[in-house]
Amino acid sequence: MTTQHSPGLFRRLAHGSLVKQILAGLILGILLAWISKPAAEAVGLLGTLFVGALKAVAPILVLMLVMASIANHQHGQKTNIRPILFLYLLGTFSAALAAVIFSFAFPSTLHLSSSAGDISPPSGIVEVMRGLVMSMVSNPIDALLKGNYIGILVWAIGLGFALRHGNETTKNLVNDMSNAVTFMVKLVIHFAPIGIFGLVSSTLATTGFSTLWGYAQLLVVLVGCMLLVALVVNPLLVWWKIRRNPFPLVLLCLRESGVYAFFTRSSAANIPVNMALCEKLNLDRDTYSVSIPLGATINMAGAAITITVLTLAAVNTLGIPVDLPTALLLSVVASLCACGASGVAGGSLLLIPLACNMFGISNDIAMQVVAVGFIIGVLQDSCETALNSSTDVLFTAAACQAEDDRLANSALRN
């Protein structure tokens, strides 16, 4: 006679969502630091291993994803998506700019193990631009070894355009390599709960529980900035496009797209939801069938906010002065970084080192910032995805409605 036992708490966590596992690791790390400081410091090795794995996989991830995306671009698709594409890019840049303003208004700091003496901060915008240009012409192998993400991007874009003229077998190989690297990233991400357990335990054991308040403040800045973009910046852009009250459309998209994306934490998984909402709004099928998948790739307002806020938090922590031109340049760089964050779990976090390079911050310190992002990622990633995905359908609807209004007005004049 066999008896069936209901799955215990550990089994449910082991087979549950990554969000629940990370939350469990966060709670267990806090408890261990509170109960035993020596034990908490000992398990810090788990966090060190996790950060090391991130450092190893991030450069090759950026190279393969960008190269495969450009090489496999499909020609001949003619749809009326230029206004939507413009809104995507303008919205992402506006989000990064709002994040800069928010970060200056409410500066946050992080608890990093390295001191400001480990870096050589730039003196101004001229030195930053010189550093960016020199990074672009770096040897590709050297760029991969040193985590020079700007150089990696340049080589990935160049190779991607060159491979467009290659045969389909070569393009398929590049795409398969990209999928293989993405699989490795997902494998590393699956160990995030263990890594976060070690990071939280060792951090609290060495710096005290006051560290939590620093992360809480950082979360408030991140989520507050995302709310500002969702409820102020995006409505302004939509009003500029349709010239009428934008909030019914904004709230509809947040309710029927954003809420679902908040829990799935995947813009790609939310594409069918956005497609259904576009059909419900009677939008042009030829337009939204292209713009929604495109938006899931390049419309990354939430990612731009995450990259900007965490980068400026690291800058504040290290005491690096930031002038206005450099802050504006950061908005542009964060926007470009955000466009490369699609389809990867924690993609926006893994692209933070690229923005950190602007300020002379080493890859080691930048990856500590990434680790902080994973600690707060339970809420940050959900809010980021909700903003990203709901904005896809919002801007698509705004552009389509503006075009319908233009055609209707033209018909009335005739």
Curated annotation (Swiss-Prot):
Periplasmic side: 37-45, 105-142, 201-217, 321-331
Membrane topology summary: Multi-pass membrane protein
Compartments in which it is found: Cell inner membrane
Gene Ontology, cellular component aspect: plasma membrane
KW Transmembrane helix (keyword) present: yes
Transmembrane segments: 16-36, 46-66, 84-104, 143-163, 180-200, 218-238, 300-320, 332-352
Superkingdom: Bacteria
PROSITE patterns, sorted: NA_DICARBOXYL_SYMP_1 (PS00713)
Catalytic activity: L-serine(in) + Na(+)(in) = L-serine(out) + Na(+)(out); L-threonine(in) + Na(+)(in) = L-threonine(out) + Na(+)(out)
One BP term from GO: serine transport
Keyword Transmembrane helix: yes
MF terms (GO), sorted A to Z: neutral L-amino acid:sodium symporter activity
Entry keyword set: Amino-acid transport, Cell inner membrane, Cell membrane, Membrane, Symport, Transmembrane, Transmembrane helix, Transport
Residue ranges, Cytoplasmic side: 2-15, 67-83, 164-179, 239-299, 353-414
InterPro entries with a match to the protein in the record: Na-dicarboxylate_symporter (IPR001991), Na:dicarbo_symporter_sf (IPR036458), Ser_Thr_transp_SstT (IPR023025)
Family indicated by similarity: Belongs to the dicarboxylate/amino acid:cation symporter (DAACS) (TC 2.A.23) family.
HAMAP family the UniProt entry points to: Ser_Thr_transp_SstT
Function (record text): Involved in the import of serine and threonine into the cell, with the concomitant import of sodium (symport system).
Protein name, UniProt field: Serine/threonine transporter SstT
